[in-house]
Each structure stands twice: as C-alpha cells, then as structure tokens.
C-alpha cells in the first residue's frame, strides 16, 4: 500500500490519528513508525515480494505500525487472533507459509516453541524498528495495486480456518466505498474494540478512520465502563459494533443506576452515526 493510499499519513500532519491507552499518536508519528518498521523488515532488500508476515498483536499503535509496515515493504500482512489455541495457529502459519512472526512481550513468549518448531523467525516490533538504523535504511518499493496485501483467516465454523486474500486494490475499493457511504471526515472520532483479525475491525473502522484523517481510540477488548464514560463525555461521534456488543451494553445497564443509563443513551443519541453490523440485529434488540 503506497503512502498515497492513506493521504493523511504524512510527516507534517500533527492531527491525532490514534489514542492507545494514555498515549496519543499523530499521523506524522504513525507515519514515521511505519516507515522505520518497513525499512527494518526489508533489511537492505528492495522488496519483500509478497513474503507472508504474520503478527500476534491486539489493537494498538504497534498493530497499525506492523500492518502498514508490511504493506509498504511489499509483504502480505496476516493478522492473527490473539485468543487462538496453538493448534489453530499451527494450521494458519503452516497453510499461509509464514516466514516471520511479529509479537511482543507475553505474546512472544507464548509463541517461541511453535515458531521454533515451524522454523519461523519470531521478532518484536521494537526489534524490527531498531534494525532500521541509519546505516541500513532501505528505500521503500513502489507497490502495484494488483499485488496481494492481506490474508485473513475465516472463523472455521464449517472446517479449519481458510486464508482469504485481498489485494491492495481490493482494500482501497472497500475503504473508499465505506468512507463515501458513511460520510467519514477528519472530524470523526470512533472507538475500536472489535477483533482486528476480521474485516469489520480492520477495514470498516481502523482503515476508514486512518484514510479519512479521523481519530480512532484503540481498545484490546470492549471495556464497557471506560467506553461508557467516553460516550457520556461526547468523545465519540461514530460508533460501530456487532449485535453482541449492544447486548452486553444493555446487560450492563442492569448494574448501574437509571440516571447513568440515561446519560449513556443521550450520548449515543448525540452521535452522528451508530452502526450494528457483521450479523443480523435481533428485532428485540433493535
């Protein structure tokens, strides 16, 4: 994915792109991290030539750095479910012919034996970025839109998970279509708590936000109390979720007082856009 594909990811853009915990990242900061990570992946090579690079990282600034860094270096990004069992990971890594795995901290520790057995290089985000020192900075390749960009694995409800491949052109078409349909602008602010190994979280929320210059607040899970506080404070003007999330939110209402429930409902009412997607919304819930 070329830099032009995400027009707000520029070195001179000081607007906030990501909020990850207590840290805000500007588009310029994110762009710099992506470039350094991409250069570190290349290690002096001109192009990754669709090398399959998996990552085991929850929604975070590191996740964005890895996804876009792999794209800019010419690889195929393979985000994995951080809740997957070893057997499922083994299947995904083997069937995708993964050569490198990116993971941090405890996630990295849990993958050491598996990656060693499969002869997959296991490195952290920081390791890759540090490898892009001033003496080893690689110019980034020009990526044709028809090249493969991402492989997502299905949920495996009928059989083992299957890898579904998207090209850079496909991703651009999906993102720009959704931006137009939902009238995304750089003034939008949205929370991301959906899984980032599925298309809803990756494309509908994260990619649309970054492409349009909006701000996304990153959560590794649906933290109802914390997100509810932000809804009351009018932090978000866009909210996208699956029906299960709305069910959990309604169940949460039973544990708090009615005044607080009303404040949360009023916060939703003030948003410009609420979406329930990826599955049918039950009539009773609607």
Regions found by a protein language model. Give the residues of each.
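AMP-dependent adenylate-forming
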Residues: 4-26, 44
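Conserved AMP-binding/adenylate-forming
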Residues: 23, 38-87
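Conserved pre-ATP/AMP-binding loop-to-beta segment of ANL
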Residues: 135-153, 159-160, 183-189
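ANL superfamily adenylate-forming
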Residues: 106-146, 253-256
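Conserved ATP-dependent adenylate/AMP-binding module captured primarily in the ANL superfamily
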Residues: 82-114, 131-132, 174-191, 223-237
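Conserved AMP-binding/adenylation subdomain of ANL enzymes
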Residues: 172-189, 199-240, 248-256
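Conserved adenylate-forming
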Residues: 86, 117, 121-123, 220-286
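Conserved AMP-binding A3 loop
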Residues: 26-28, 149-176
């Amino acid at each position: 994915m070329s830099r032009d594909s995400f027009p707000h990811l520029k070195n001179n853009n000081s607007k906030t792109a990501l909020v990850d915990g207590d840290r805000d990242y500007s588009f310029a900061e994110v762009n710099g991290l992506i470039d350094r990570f991409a250069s570190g992946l290349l290690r002096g090579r001109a192009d990754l030539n669709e090398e399959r690079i998996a990552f085991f990282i929850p929604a975070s600034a590191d996740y964005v750095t890895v996804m876009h860094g792999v794209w800019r270096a010419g690889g195929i990004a393979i985000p994995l479910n951080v809740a997957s069992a070893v057997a499922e990971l083994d299947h995904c890594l083997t069937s995708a012919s993964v050569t490198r795995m990116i993971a941090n901290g405890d996630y990295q520790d849990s993958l050491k034996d598996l990656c060693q057995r499969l002869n997959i290089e296991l490195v952290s985000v920081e390791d890759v970025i540090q490898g892009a020192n001033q003496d080893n900075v690689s110019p980034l390749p020009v990526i044709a839109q028809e090249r493969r960009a991402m492989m997502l694995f299905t949920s495996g409800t009928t059989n083992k998970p299957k890898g579904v491949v998207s090209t850079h052109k496909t991703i651009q078409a999906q993102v720009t279509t959704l931006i137009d349909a939902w009238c995304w602008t750089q003034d939008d602010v949205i929370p991301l708590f959906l899984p980032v190994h599925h298309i809803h979280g990756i494309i509908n929320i994260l990619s649309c936000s970054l492409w349009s210059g909006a701000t996304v607040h990153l959560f590794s899970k649906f933290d109802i109390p914390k997100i509810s506080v932000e809804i009351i404070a009018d932090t978000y003007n866009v909210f996208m979720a699956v029906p299960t999330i709305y069910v959990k939110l309604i169940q949460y209402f039973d544990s708090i007082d009615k005044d607080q429930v009303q404040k949360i409902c009023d916060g939703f009412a003030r948003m410009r856009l609420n979406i329930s997607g990826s599955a049918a919304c039950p009539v009773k819930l609607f």
